[in-house]
Amino acid sequence: MNVQIEESWRQRLQPEFDKDYFRTLTDFVRSEYAHGPVYPPGRLIFNAFNLCPFDQVKVVLIGQDPYHEPGQAQGLCFSVNEGVPFPPSLVNIFKEIKNDIGTDVPTSGSLVRWAQQGILLLNATLTVRAHQAGSHQGRGWETFTDAVIRILADEREHLVFLLWGAYAQRKGNFIDPNRHLLLASPHPSPLSASRGFFGNKHFSRTNEYLRLHGKQPIVW
């Protein structure tokens, strides 16, 4: 499995890599890649970390699974490759950004530019079998990404955690709200966006908090 992880993350996550559950997870993921299409491509499994070193993280956006259709997943939650049509949740994210801060909807659904500005675009599960949503859940990725969130919450201060939907909110339930800003709302999925994702103003609120703590705001 051809994966790399950025050095500042490797230093902090090495204790996780050395645990039995992660070795078991690695064996499972290698077997999956050997026997059929799995997304994202192996070299992009840790893309969220490679594009956003530990000390540069300002915002953490928690997703659930990678996209499971060909050509979509690039190792960043909610993001798709250049030229790929926007999935419905991403359409709604861009719609809320436009309504919140007036930024026009971009031509690309790639959120690499967000990652490069300090947004960790973290899926709870980092791989998925083609055409089978949730197929790699319960194999150990959730334990690993819980550790990522805990390390950030404990070692850093004044981060913004964007928790969209009940799954992400459960994932963030141990974060100290006195140390970080937790912004929770329904998920941007068409099934729930009208129940409180639209109008949540999370993008302007994120930037207000970053400015308050002397950090550069995000160019959404």
Where on the chain are the PLM-derived regions?
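Generic N-terminal amphipathic, Lys/Arg-enriched alpha-helix
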Residues: 1-13
